[in-house]
Amino acid sequence: MNDLESLLKELDCKTPADEISSERRDPILDFLKMESEYRRQHKIKRLLRLSGVKHVKTLDQFDWHFNLKISKDDILTFVNSPWIENAFNLVLIGDTGLGKSHIASAICYEAILRGYPTACITAFDLVSRIHKAYNPASRIDYYAKVRVLCIDELGYTYHKKEDTDTLFQIISKRNEILPTIVTTNLLCGAPHKRFNAELIVMRRGVSREPTITQLFQ
């Protein structure tokens, strides 16, 4: 299948490629390439608007020299792996100010650029939105089924048991089916092992409060 045939199929055009005369093929091919790129950019803007990513951040913008204990190789290995297709999870653990949210947001942006619906939200905002929703079950279902979910700042506030149960319900529904990224300042109970996640510890001292264990037991 040549470029013209591929683009006609991608854009759901009904005209067969063999019915396009040779002198018209080049300008039509140029137009189809432009249309394909326009649709791709439009999709990215739409996914970004729906994702909750407030400011676009990339891994290239991250200051890897700020803390040399953060493994750039580990992060890039994860990003370049089929983590979305294979539902690989990721837990970023470390103290406040080490860049966990930046890295998580950048990984979410990579998913958006690849055309995947993504939700990036703090744990506090997630449970708040569920509480305020007209149909909480429907909102839980959305976060359980969105292609890529990032729960930021898990453990920065103490949740009620019902909130913890809600977070656990979402994570357990996604486990081994859809990829989940979690950032937290808590290191207790090996949470990455509880839901089959890659663990990257961004060190400068981490809290050892027990709250997070409730989510992964």
Segments predicted by a language model, with ranges:
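Residue-level preference for the first positions of well-ordered beta-strands
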Residues: 89-91, 148, 179
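Interdomain "pre-motor" coupling segment immediately N-terminal to P-loop NTPase/helicase cores
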Residues: 5-55
